[in-house]
Each structure stands twice: as structure tokens, then as C-alpha cells.
Design a protein with these regions (language model features):
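A short, polar/proline- and glycine-enriched secondary-structure boundary/capping micro-motif
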Residues: 96, 134, 159-168
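A conserved amphipathic terminal alpha-helix motif
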Residues: 166-212, 217-219
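Short, solvent-exposed aromatic-acidic interface loops
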Residues: 125-129, 152-161
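An amphipathic alpha-helical core segment
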Residues: 140-142, 147, 152-158, 169-170
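Hydrophobic, Leu/Ile/Phe/Ala-enriched alpha-helical segments that form helix-helix packing faces
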Residues: 53-64, 105, 185-197
Length: 232
């Protein structure tokens, strides 16, 4: 199916998981943090690192096109946007999958007594996606010292959907490619932000794995809903 038709089909598709579902031993929960070029203390500066990084996130330029490419209807608002993702494995296998932006925010927050400005969005997987779950991307600026960081939070599991060969490929390579995608997002946004600021194209500091709650670490699924990022 042509990408244009596949994108149009996403409009009527539901999510491929129950939003009231609970994580269990087959779900992965990941959270990464990546330091970005900083600013002076205070609210985000016009043309500064925070605003640049926010634009990169909104335009989905954080994704490495060798791993994931995205298409959406130009001019659509961020919240509610349907995105057709092309998942690539070593430039040989390609799978199309749909996601929908279910939330977007640009808000002040307070964490551990510190004030921050936070921009971000969350998308969730649609029917037919080889994975199920949700993922969010955020850009933080700390008001007290001007530090800027990118955060990525994901809760996902295999959906069991798609042709047999895609399910087999996901079982064999999915988790490895998933983590590679996460870390590449962190590296790309750091490099692209620095480049737009005219800074040297040096390798960024490595992303920090803030949270990992894989099978043996995931709490017993009592009554906890599928967790969303709380900004913690």
C-alpha cells in the first residue's frame, strides 16, 4: 500500500492496547536523559538551546532516518496527529506502523524544589503496529542554572500483530533495535542542537539510563495503569 493511502487509513484506527492495561513481565519500561547545550539561568531564551530542541522534537528530527522515518499530514496540530512510521532494519526490511499523538504540553513544572519549563508530546501505537504501548519525548530547561536536557520515556511490548515474518523479526531483533533507536535519538538531538547553535560538532556526553524496569523488575500487575511519565 502506498504511504499516502496508509497514512489516510490511520484516521479511523483505534489504539492496539487497552489504556487501562497493566504492565507485566513482557513489557519494557525505559527512561533516558540526555544533556543538551545549556543557557543562562531564567526562562528559555529566544533562539536558545531549549527552543531549538523543542522544534527538533516537534518535527521528529530526533529519529535516526536509518532506523525510523515518519510521515504525517502537513499543518496538522501536534496533539491528535497521526504519524505513519517506517521501521527499518539494516536498510533491508521495512515495516509501516501507525501511532497517534495523544498528549502534548508546554508547561512550568517543579521537581525537588527546582523550577523547570517542559515541552513534550506522547504518542501511542495504533492497530496493526508490531509493538503496543506509548512513548513520550520531553525537553526540560531548569530555571535556576540554565541546564537543558532531553528525556525519553517508553512503555512497550510486542503486540503479536502483523505478518509472521515481522513478528519473528521483532522477536529476534526488536529489543536490540528498540534500544539502539532510543540512544540514537539522544545522540541526534544533542548533535543537532549544538550544530544549530554553531557549537563544535563534538561527540555529546552519553545518555543516562534513568530507568529500566524490564521483566523481572516490573512490579506485580495489581491495579497500576500502564505508567505515563510523571516528570520524575
Amino acid at each position: 500500500m502506498r504511504p499516502e493511502r496508509a497514512l489516510a487509513r490511520l484516521q479511523g484506527l483505534p489504539l492496539n492496547f487497552d489504556e487501562g492495561a497493566v504492565p507485566h513481565h513482557r513489557w519494557h519500561v525505559d527512561q533516558l536523559s540526555q544533556a543538551l547545550p545549556g543557557e543562562l539561568p531564567g526562562e528559555p531564551a529566544r533562539g536558545g538551546a531549549w527552543r531549538i530542541a523543542c522544534r527538533l522534537v516537534e518535527d521528529y528530527r530526533i529519529a535516526d532516518p536509518a532506523i525510523v522515518r515518519a510521515t504525517w499530514e502537513p499543518g496538522t496540530p501536534l496533539e491528535g496527529r497521526n504519524m505513519l512510521l517506517e521501521l527499518r532494519l539494516y536498510r533491508v526490511l521495512r515495516v509501516h506502523a501507525g501511532v497517534r499523538v495523544t498528549r502534548a504540553w508546554d508547561e512550568p513544572r517543579r521537581q525537588d524544589g527546582r523550577r523547570a519549563r517542559v515541552f513534550g508530546f506522547e504518542y501511542a501505537t495504533l492497530d496493526g503496529h508490531i509493538e503496543m504501548g506509548r512513548m513520550d519525548y520531553e525537553v526540560w530547561k531548569w530555571i535556576d542554572d540554565g541546564a537543558v536536557e532531553f528525556r525519553l520515556h517508553a512503555v512497550s511490548g510486542a503486540s503479536g500483530q502483523g505478518p509472521p515474518w515481522t513478528r519473528l523479526g521483532f522477536r529476534l531483533f526488536g529489543r536490540r533495535e528498540q534500544l539502539r533507536f532510543y540512544f540514537r535519538c539522544c545522540e541526534r538531538i544533542a548533535r543537532l542542537t549544538a550544530r544549530e547553535l554553531g557549537l563544535p560538532d563534538d561527540p555529546p556526553s552519553p545518555a543516562v539510563r534513568v530507568r529500566k524496569a524490564d521483566p523481572t523488575q516490573t512490579p506485580e500487575p495489581a491495579a497500576n495503569p500502564l505508567p505515563r511519565s510523571s516528570g520524575a
